[in-house]
Structure formats: C-alpha cells, structure tokens
Curated annotation (Swiss-Prot):
Keywords: DNA-binding, Metal-binding, Nucleus, Repeat, Repressor, Transcription, Transcription regulation, Ubl conjugation, Zinc, Zinc-finger. One of its GO terms (cellular component) is cytoplasm. This is Probable DNA-binding protein creA. Interacts with creB. Belongs to the creA/MIG C2H2-type zinc-finger protein family. SMART domains: ZnF_C2H2 (SM00355).
Length: 427
C-alpha cells in the first residue's frame, strides 16, 4: 500500500518526534514491506535530525563568540568617559576623539590634512594616488602653487645675495697668493669662519658702501673691511703692498680695522712662531718691513730689545720696524669723522676683532704728544726709563685692560719690555 507509506514518510519529515508511534502501526499493515520500512524510517530520521540541528548551529554561533568577547577583561579604560577597551591602541584611538589630536599627517606635497586614525589617512591617500580624481588634481595645483612660492622666495634670496658677489672677483685673484706666500696670516678658526661668512655676504668693497647701506650694521662692515684688507694687501709683493696699505684713497673704516686684524693675527702668529720651517722663515724675513702680520713671529727678538709691542702703542720709537704705524698720524688728519664713527659703533656688538680697536686708535695720538718717548726708548738701561714711562703708556695699558679682549699677551709683553718687568709694582 504505497499511499500510507508515503504519508508516513512525510509525517516523519515534518514531525520527527512521532517516529516511534508512526512506525509501529505501519509494520502490521504490510508484512511484505517490512525489510524496506526500517531503512526508510532510519534515513528519514537522520534527515530530520540534521535539519533540526542546523538552525541552532547557525543561530548560536554569533552569540557564543559575543559571550566570549564579553568575558575577556578590558584593562584599558578611558580616563574621560566610562568606556573600556581590550587593546591599548583602541584606547589611544578613542582618547583622540576627546582631545582632537590628529597625529597622522598627509605626506603629499601641498596637502595639509591630518587625521586621528591611520586608516583614515590611508583612505585619504588614495585620493592623491588616483589621477582621475578632481580632488587629486586640485591638490596637485595647490602643491604646484606652494612650490612656486617657495621657488620665488629662493629666487629673492639668491638675487639678494647675488648683488654683492660681483665685486668679490678681485679677491679670488689674490686669495691663492696669500695662501702660498703667508700661510700663518690666517686668524684663529672662529674668526676665520666668522670673517669668511661676513666676506661672502658683504663683499670686498663693503667699506665703500657704508653710507649707502644704512640698514647694515657698521660693525659688520668693519669686520668685512678688515678681512678684505688682509686678503688684498698681504697677498701682493713687498713694494706695492706698502704703498696700497697706507695710501690716502682708503676710507677710515677700511684702514682702521687693519689694527684688529693685526692684533688677532699678532697673537695667533706668535703662537705659531715656533712651528715655522726654514723656507717659510725666509719668506717672513723677506716681507718683514712691509707686512704687519709677518712681524709678529719675530716679536721675541723685539722683546729682548725692549721694543716688542711698542709698534702698537708708541710708533715714534719704531718707525723703521713698523711702517704700518707711521701713517696712522696722517690718518687722524685725513678722516677723523669716519674714525670716530667706527669707534663709537664697533663696541656696541662684541665680536672678537672690533672690540679692542678703541684703545689702539688713541694710542698713536697719545704717542705724538712728546718726542721724549723716542729718547726714553733709546736708553738701554731699564732703570732710567722707569719714572717717565707711566705718563704715556700707562693710559694705553689701562685702556687695553678694560675691554678684556684678546690683548693679554700684548699687554704682558708691554709691561715687561717698556718698564723693565716691574710695571705692576708701581700700580
């Protein structure tokens, strides 16, 4: 009887819990079908059980994982609200929503956007990487405009710096000669870096533009002039160097800083005097009457003759040894106004070299008061030179001690050579 068997099969599928009750009455109905009936009911029961088990598995998967996540500890709590997080980076990212911090900046040129999350930055970077996007084209235009503005700034800086270098061409001709002829004329390293920086910015003829360039500091002009004067005049041969160094065509600011250049290189070359070889000492002896810097290595010989620093302070006593100091009396007559202008403004800023120039300018004028200084210096005995000496050099020594600059070696040699070593006892 096929219809009852089919009905029993559908009922097993729809109602699996009635498998036992339905299967027992079906067996007496047809005894010939008994071998096939258990197999059909077993297959139907397996299918029903599989169908009945599928919904709980599909429905219970997500709640089970959620329960596990809820059971995990949340040690990272937000200090500004009640939320807690499993991981530290999640807490950090959440705190940025309170503080407004945006540490992730776009690296595309011209783009100034910042983001608090790295995934937002990654999503934003795709805008720049996509060439078909309108925003990427706009960003490229902004970047090009920013680059053009930066290029204009650089061009303005280059044009401003290019206004001075054309006069610096004569210096390139004289610089190799000065390096070969007189290597120890270079000042200490700090001053060389400072002076080279000033020289590149101001140029060799900066002393002629003092009155025109009112915006520049006169101290910087004096520094550049001193460096230029050394590079120009010490690099030529002996004869023209003497005439160009003391010709009346020089301005006061160009001539007077040579004292500072001489003072600095005087101390430095005195320290290097023991390192000279025979070939270089020959060049020093050849240029001694004309080069004020090269007279410094032979200063110990002057100190034995009681004339060591006297070319700096009493030019009447040593006209033959130091021709550089002889025209300083005429310089006071030529341009006194420029000299006083440089005197008043150079001590305002205190680089190394313009500071001690004040006492040096007045010391030659003090030496011109009485010709008795030459008579006193010509006396071989130191005891005869004791009493009159503090009248003139005492003021110069005090003026040199007041600035506290790099003239300590010169002042000590002055006290020993002029006063016979006991100048400090009379103070």
């Amino acid at each position: 009887m096929p219809p009852p068997a089919s009905s029993v099969d559908f009922s097993n599928l729809l109602n699996p819990q009635n498998n036992s009750t339905d299967s027992t009455p079906s067996t007496p109905v047809d005894s010939s079908k008994t071998p096939s009936t258990p197999s059909s009911t077993q297959s139907n029961s397996n299918m029903a059980s599989s169908v009945s088990l599928l919904p709980p598995l599909m429905k219970g998967a997500r709640p089970a994982t959620e329960e596990v996540r809820q059971d995990l500890p949340r040690p990272y709590k937000c200090p500004l609200c009640d939320r807690a997080f499993h991981r530290l980076e999640h807490q950090t990212r959440h705190i940025r929503t309170h503080t407004g911090e945006k540490p992730h900046a776009c690296q595309f040129p011209g783009c100034t956007k910042r983001f608090s999350r790295s995934d937002e930055l990654t999503r934003h970077s795709r805008i720049h990487n996509n060439p078909n996007s309108r925003r990427s084209n706009k960003a490229q235009h902004l970047a090009a405009a920013a680059a053009a503005a930066a290029g204009q700034d650089n061009a303005m800086a280059n044009t401003a710096s290019a206004m001075m270098p054309p006069p610096s061409k004569p210096m390139t001709r004289s610089a190799p000669v000065s390096q070969v002829g007189s290597p120890d004329i270079s000042p200490p390293h700090s001053f060389s870096n400072y002076a080279s920086h000033m020289r590149s910015n101001l140029g060799p003829y900066a002393r002629k533009g003092e009155r025109a360039s009112s915006g520049m500091d006169i101290n910087l002009l004096a520094t550049a002039a001193s460096q230029v004067e050394r590079d120009e005049h010490f690099s030529f041969h002996a004869g023209p160097r003497n005439h160009h160094l003391f010709s009346s065509r020089h301005h006061g600011s160009g001539r007077l800083p040579s004292l500072s250049a001489y003072a600095i290189t005087h101390n430095m070359s005195r320290s290097h005097s023991h390192e000279d070889d025979d070939g270089y000492s020959h060049r020093v002896k050849r240029s001694r009457p004309n080069s004020p810097n090269s007279t410094a290595p032979s200063s110990p010989t002057f100190s034995h003759d009681s004339l060591s620093p006297t070319p700096d302070h009493t030019p009447l006593a040593t006209p033959a040894h130091s021709p550089r100091l002889r025209p300083l009396g005429s310089s006071d007559l030529h341009l006194p106004s420029i000299r006083h202008l440089s005197l008043h403004h150079t001590p305002a800023l205190a680089p190394m070299e313009p500071q001690p120039e004040g006492p040096n300018y007045y010391s030659p004028s003090q030496g011109h008061h009485g010709p008795s200084i030459s008579d006193i210096m010509s006396k071989p005995d130191g005891t005869q030179r004791k009493l009159p000496v503090p009248q003139v050099p005492k003021v110069a020594v005090q003026d040199m001690l007041n600035p506290g600059s790099g003239f300590s070696s010169v002042t000590s040699s002055t006290a020993n050579s002029v006063a016979g070593g006991d100048l400090a006892e009379r103070f």
